[in-house]
Amino acid sequence: LPVKSLRESREKLEGVARNTKPWKSLLKFAPLDTRYPRPTAQDLALLLYTSGTTGAPKGVMLTHRNLEANARMGEEWIQPGNDEVIYSVLPLFHAYGMTLGLSISMICQARLVIFPTVDIDLMLKAMKKTMPTILPAVPPVYRRLLDEAKKRNISLQGIRYAVSGAMNLPHELV
């Protein structure tokens, strides 16, 4: 990995869980066995959980078509180029992180840089090597990022799209 602290974090991760197969070995068997039906656009792809802003968090059933439609919407908004870099600091188990991080990066064929947690220091170090062109985040992350970048005299001009969600974006951050 290009950033030392990311390399060190990866090295601290535990080894392969028992009874799992390495990803590369799974790729050899990519075609689905004919005994199993191929998933359709209407089939359940995953359960994502809401943040509970209107009550208790809920598990939302999303189909393959839902995921693709959300990613395609993002693609239409952003009109990606050939060299997009998306920083993913949002949890992938929520719709916002899944859609504007993981799903859109696949649709747009963008490079996806996933951060294990919101770590402004780590993000700014990574930006010295690879500036994101797309940064989906929440207002508190933008506030901290702007404050720290200003203190350290780091330009954020390479970010073409800073997509905000989950709460109101204060006018002073726009």
Each model region followed by its residue ranges:
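Conserved S/T- and glycine-rich ATP-binding loop of Class I adenylate-forming
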Residues: 44, 50-53, 86, 92, ...
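Conserved AMP-binding A3 loop
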Residues: 45-69
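Short beta-strand->loop structural element characteristic of the AMP-binding/adenylate-forming
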Residues: 1, 58-61, 88, 110-117
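Conserved G/P- and acidic residue-centered "switch" motifs that form tight phosphate/ATP-binding loops
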Residues: 53, 109, 166
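Conserved AMP-binding/adenylation subdomain of ANL enzymes
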Residues: 68-85, 93-134, 144, 148-150
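Adenylate-forming
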Residues: 27, 90, 118-119, 132-174
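Phosphate-coordination loops involved in phosphoryl transfer and adenosine-cofactor binding
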Residues: 41, 82-83, 158-159
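ANL superfamily adenylate-forming
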Residues: 1-41, 149
